[in-house]
Amino acid sequence: MLSPKRTKFRKQHRGRMKGVSYRGNRICFGRFALQALEPAWITSGQIEAGRRTINRYARRGGKIWVRIFPDKPITMRPAETRMGSGKGSPEYWVSVIRPGRILYEMGGVSETVARAAARIAAYKMPIRTQFVTT
């Protein structure tokens, strides 16, 4: 699963997901894409599950580009721990997604195959998405 090799700081604030995505909201590499319509955190496991389903469905001559990367650590405290004694340890990584962000791009396949692959990958995502073309 995806995670940064090294970061400047081990822990981050949770932050707020306001507004729409102005970066990464256009198709750059392929002809078809899956675009987010809601704000959310998408975990590295969800990104990998979507990538695998697209690869499995569009394996004949198609190319996939994953346009998001999980760079935010999410901390959790051990179960049945008393309050206090600092912030928990990092458990998993997420990518902060705002509306309009391109999640995956596809090229080298027909539109029907790309649309079907994007629909299957959209079931793996915790947000509403839409299929877009160039």
UniProtKB/Swiss-Prot annotation:
State the organism named in the record.
Answer: Pinus thunbergii (Japanese black pine)
The UniProt transmembrane annotation reads none
What HAMAP family does UniProt report for this protein, alphabetically? Ribosomal_uL16 (MF_01342)
Q: What molecular functions are annotated in GO for this chain?
A: rRNA binding; structural constituent of ribosome
What's the protein called, per UniProt?
Large ribosomal subunit protein uL16c
Q: Tell me, how does this one assemble?
A: Part of the 50S ribosomal subunit.
Any Pfam family from its record, for instance, is Ribosomal_L16
Q: Which gene encodes it?
A: rpl16
> What keyword terms does UniProt attach to this protein?
Chloroplast, Plastid, Ribonucleoprotein, Ribosomal protein
Q: Which family does it belong to?
A: Belongs to the universal ribosomal protein uL16 family.
Q: Name one GO biological process term.
A: mitochondrial translation
Q: Which GO terms describe its cellular component?
A: chloroplast; mitochondrial large ribosomal subunit
